Each structure stands twice: as C-alpha cells, then as structure tokens.
Amino acid sequence: MKELKKHYQRAFLALIKAYKRYYLGVWIIKLPFYKLTSNQHKITKWQAKRDERLEFLHNALKTFKFLRTFDEESKKWLNSPEFKAKYLDTKHPYPPLLNPDSVDYKCIPAELAWEINLPLPPNYDFIYFVVWGCASRSTLTYFSQEGLRLSPFCSDLPTIEQYKLTFDFLKNSTIKIKKILLIHSYTSNFIGEKYLYLVVKNVPVFIVVRDPISIVKTWANHTHPNPNKINKFNLTFDYHQVLDCIVYDSGKNPNMDNEGVYLASQSCSFAQKKYLPYFTKNPKIIIDASDLSVDNAYRTMQNLGKKLNFTLTLPKKDYVNKSNTSTFHNLFPFILICHSGDLTKMFKGGFEQRNMKSLEYKNSIKIIITDGIRGNAWRRNRDYTQLNGIESQQILFFISQKNAQKLYSDKSLFESTKEYLQGFIKALNKRIALESKNQLAEKDILEYFAKNKAQRQKYKTIFDENLSFYKELCPDIVESWKYYNEFEKMCAELDKSKERQNERI
C-alpha cells in the first residue's frame, strides 16, 4: 500500500518520541525533590504523568509492531475462507484489509483504519439516529445528564474526518461507560455510503419520530442567532429591550413561503431513505416525540433504560424545565452583571438609565441566565450554584460559589437583584406569549398547503419517500399523527376534485 510506508515512518518517530519522554524527560529529576519536600500532591501528579507516558509508550510500541507485520497479516486474511464468504461472495463494496474481529484497534491510526476499510471500533452500546425537529436536543441532554457518552459529530467535517473523530473516540473510551454512536440524518451533508458501511455492530437503533406537519412547523418557526443580541447587561438595562432579539429564519415573523423551510425540512428531518437502509438488520426502538415532553420524559427514560441497559441516576425533578423549542434555541444564555454602583439607576419598568461602566468592573458579580437544556453544564460545575430566592418555570440562574457569598452578604444588592430578575421573568413570559401568538400552528400549515398546490406536492413527495419506513416499523405511531393523516386526506380529496374537473372538460 502506497500510504503504508508513511504510517510506518510516523509510528517509528512516535515511538522514539514516547521513549524519550518516558526515559529521558526532565520530569524524572523532579521526583527526588518532591520526596525531599514531602509534597504529596506533586508526587501524585508525577505518578499520574508517569503512568500516562508509560501507556503512550506501550501504545506507540504496539502500533510500530503492528505496522511491521501488516502485510503478512493482511495477506493471511485476504486469502482466508472467512473473508471470501463474508465479503467477496456478498460483493461487499468496502471489504476490510484486516480481520476486524482479531485486530487490536488501539494499535491502528484512524487515518490508516479508514484506508483499509476497518469498521468503527465496536465499543458502542446502541445507535441514536438523530432526526432534527424530533426532540433531538432534549434527547441528547437526557442521555448526557445520565452519564452516557455521545460520539462527537460536526456537520461541517468531510466524511473521512468524521470517521477519524469517531474512531478515536471509540477506541479510547473505557468499556464501563455506556456509549452512544450518533448518526445525524443530513442529506445536505450526507455522511457517506462508506462511513455507514463501516458501522457494523448489531446493536439497537433508537429513533424518535414525530408528526411530519409538526416537524415542518418547527422549521417554519425556526430562529437563528441575532448578531445584535445583548449577551451581557447590568441592572440598569431595560430587560424588555434585552429580550427583543428573536429573529426567525424567514425574517421578523414565520413564513411558509420562505424556501428555507422546505430545504431545512428536506435536508435535516426527512433523510430516512438515505440512512435507514444501512440498518435493516439492527433491532429498532422507536418512540414518538410526545413521549419526551416534560410530563412524560422521566417515565420514558426509565423504559428506555430497561431496553438499552442503563440506569437513571437523577431524580424526576431534574427532568423538569428541559423542554426545548426552536423559538428560544438562540435566546439563551445571558450574563447579568450585578454591582452596587448601579442601584440608583436600576431599571424598574419605567425609564431606562443605562450605565455601561459596571460591565467592565473586575469586582462585579456575574449571574448566568440560561434555560433548562443548557443548565446541565452549570449544574455539573462544582464552582457554580443556583441562585437562591428566584424561581421560574422557564429559566435557571447560576452564580459562582465565591460570588454567591459576596452577593448574599450585601443585602441591599441581593434584594435589588431579586427584584430586577422578577421583572426579567415577567418580561420573558410576555415575550413568550407574544412570539407564540405570532408563530404558525399545525392548522396554519395545513391551510397553507390547501391553498398552495405546488408546495403541497413538494412536501408530499418527501413525506412519501421517507415515511414508508415508519409505516412499516411503527404503524401505530403513524396512525396517531393527527395532522399528517389530515394532510393525507386533504391531498386525496383535492386530487379527486381535480380529476372530476378534468373529466368535465
């Protein structure tokens, strides 16, 4: 193989580097000094560093030995009856040049693994087929908060780079931690036939589905980041102005005439026909997005845990405030700066006396304002705690432990901050009500389709092409989709009406 020589040279250089780091590093002479000063913390760090470098050396040696014997092992495998039966006779388009069942994945660089068609390391417990608009953000949050590891994904990466990223994640992961292989259903940036052929482990495929009219509604109401959003503000800012930053993909208000709604639906939510044929042999676990609502999420996750062999560690209350909508996807987080110098000009719902100075003060107190979905990262951060005395169904407030003591000890500033945040919460509720009033509902989408034949036919085509899988795998769920069934009925009636008109002519 042309590239094999390059990999061999790299492995040789990596081995020399690992040897030098372990045996000749300056860090070795530090141990006697640490022992002399009885610095146990430094000794522990030294030991951990030594173990890390020893493991690096062992892996470098394994890789070097593996590449030396690559040609011989590959020839044995390619001439074996097992290879013939499994790959040649079945005309597999990407046969591996080494036996995946006997190879040591830790010895193989990800780039070489791709070149020799090696399947992804079978170090994952199930596959989550991510369909945007089907509670995917909430689902990923639920899995993550329960300690399950999610394989990395970046939609902008070329297929080979995504493979390398996933390969390294899986080969370096510990066996004890449950891991999920994520397959994102994009058509605009299709992950590629070869990548999907290299996902071979026969584990369950988990899918969340949703009424397609509701998915279209999500894209019609979808927002994007506002470059003019005020991310950091203080007690003098008018919170109504701070919250007036929602920008829809269609402009100031949702609009089904925007071609972006169709393109987003097609490329991010209706790509089943491109992906699911590669997983026909895998068992499927399919639920409806409604099962992951705030009221149902905890019970649903318990049931999934039984089927996918993981145990919930968090109480039911931690599944509250996790609902996500595309409307507020780009609204949070905010940073509120609290400083006693702003109290005389604090905004109380009337005239604003904005003061920008405290935004740059080093001794100011910062409060993170975020939603339930993003709140998990702050919950896990031991340096932060939730702010006392403020409750909201929509948002969470986090403050560093150090700043919390500082704020609570300043009674005047603390009470004023609570008053300001109560006003912020009321303004947020008003903004939510206003945006909800402006947004399109499923009935609006159906009315639009009834009046626009060309658009109706475009959407029906992608529905028919992709939903056939669900009609076969979970017909009961498809039958429960109120708006989709109304859409199908409407299309049939309008088509019949058109046929009658043509017959009269």
Located regions from the model:
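PAPS-dependent sulfotransferase catalytic domain
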Residues: 4-54, 58-64, 69-75, 80, 191-404, 468, ...
